[in-house]
Curated annotation (Swiss-Prot):
Biased composition (Basic and acidic residues): 444-453, 488-498, 513-524, 533-552, 567-609
GO cellular component, one term: PeBoW complex
InterPro entries: BRCT_dom, BRCT_dom_sf, PES
Basic residues bias locations: 554-564
GO molecular function, one term: ribonucleoprotein complex binding
Higher taxonomy: Eukaryota, Metazoa, Ecdysozoa, Arthropoda, Hexapoda
Location in the cell: Nucleus, Nucleolus; Nucleus, Nucleoplasm
GO biological process, any: maturation of LSU-rRNA from tricistronic rRNA transcript (SSU-rRNA, 5.8S rRNA, LSU-rRNA)
Described purpose of this protein according to its UniProt entry: Required for maturation of ribosomal RNAs and formation of the large ribosomal subunit.
Protein family (similarity comment): Belongs to the pescadillo family.
Record's protein name: Pescadillo homolog
Amino acid sequence: MVKRNHKYQSGEGAQYMTRKAAMRKLQLSMQDFRRLCILKGIYPREPKHRVIAQRGSTDIKILYHRKDITFLLHEPIVWTLRDRKIFNRRIAHARAKGNNLLKNVRMANYPEIKLDHIIKERFPTFIDAIKELDDCMTLLFLFSTFPAMKVVTREITSLARRLTIEFMHYVIAAKALRKVFVSIKGYYFQAEIKGELVTWIVPHYYPFQPQRKEYVDFKIMKSFADFFTVMAGFVNYRLYNSINMVYPPQFSVSIDSDESRNNEETFVSERIAALNMDLLRSDRQGTEEEDEEIDLKLLDNDKDSEQVRKMHEEALSLSKLKNLFKGLKFFINREVPREPLVFIIRCFGGKVSWDKHLFVGSTFDETDESITHQIVDRPSLTKQYISRDYVQPQWIFDSVNQRKLLPTNKYFIGAVLPPHLSPFNRDDAIYVPPEEAAMQAGDEFEKQERAEGISDDEDEDFGMEEARKQVQLDYALVKAFREEKAEALNSGEAKKEQAEEDNEDDDQEPDQDETKKQRSEKKQKMAVVSGRVFKENPKEQKQLTKQEEALRAKMVKSRHKKLYRNLLDKQKKATKEANLLREKRQQIDKQKRKEQTQKRKAQRKEILA
């Protein structure tokens, strides 16, 4: 007898499992199940046919893949979570009895969760871990600003603070920072680590405001923080070893003072948090710079292909960016946020200091005459030095994004700042702000000038050889032209003699043949005719594009039509948003022009009065 196939025993109905069934199978509570899924990187799935996956149920339920749940059954953490549940019950029992000794024993023997094997499992290679650093560093920088709470303890916040400071020191030592941006959310930083771009956000330092549980669940965030702290420890250790730096970070110069002798660990941690001192290396520092110089020399030898030329230009701009603030000394006023600016300036080779009474780690005072720039964020200053420029903090960010030192006249104290443009815009963006378009045009003009300057230098070096080659080519061309002309004249004379003999034989030819010959001779002669501009009809062009799009849509396969429609909808949405931005910009410009005209009229009235 043939075996009967029961409903939902195969196919999509057997592939998925509800969250309740998964918790029953793993014998875990809701909190432990969530924590286990976060640590293992398992998320709910969306089936193609939800009713079949839910075995006929029309309610929307959270579904997991059955293979993921069976994968969790072999996880050692499941046993630790079950042991924790038993320990929690015993601790509550001892607390209810008032037996503090037994409770302390239970707390001391409380089972700990080890995540080392999960890190190795989720990130088989070091590059895989670097690709996940975006979320890791963003969350750790957020946790480093939290105060001590019931769920987020002081240990977690201090550990997050230490790991983020270590990561920032690596970026400073490797000069890996590429882009910076300030927004309402915080400070955006992008670094290039092992060829991968890592972008993270550092929040603004505002007082902490407690949030409701419906909006923010700190227990779930704590599970992510536990995983990311272990991951960041592994990554920092590998990164420090890759550039031959001692881990955990230590100073290259021993600091002997009364404060350091009394509490050495606290003093060293404060100095490291200052981000203003070089850390200890296991070998000399000039190895990376020498390697970069060798790479640039290799690229200089071969500039024939366009790809190599682009790589050479990018390498040159990158080498200039790494030493953008080299030789400059900055002083930060007390109203300016210290940490992000110190981090940026140190990444690009600058020296920075601040008021020594404000925070530990300052290297020079405000009265130092060698200071080149002072960063101020107030409308006026009582005392100013002639030997330095007083700029607002935006000058630092814009200079880094433009990869050059911008003029400081637009960033003086009290000046209306230019718009702070985002460096994370894509090349295929539909809407480009006019300021950014002007800056791009200026960069292209500078590149052309640089290319012309390079060509002039090459002409100076190899000018004699190229001139000789050009003279030889010109002489060969002139010689060939003269030979061709002589051959043409000889052939023309022979043709004329033959034609005269034919005319003598046939004297009675009509005059029409002569006119035809004259016309043919005129046609054979070269003539330059002025061209006419062809005007395209925009309506016809639009109609043609629509017809082409319709034909293109017909050629799409039936299984890809949904994807094609989604792409078209996305493109339409992007164009609509770009048009809205253009309209808003036009309104703003119109309002500004109106205000300027009103100011001029008011000034004229005052002058006339």
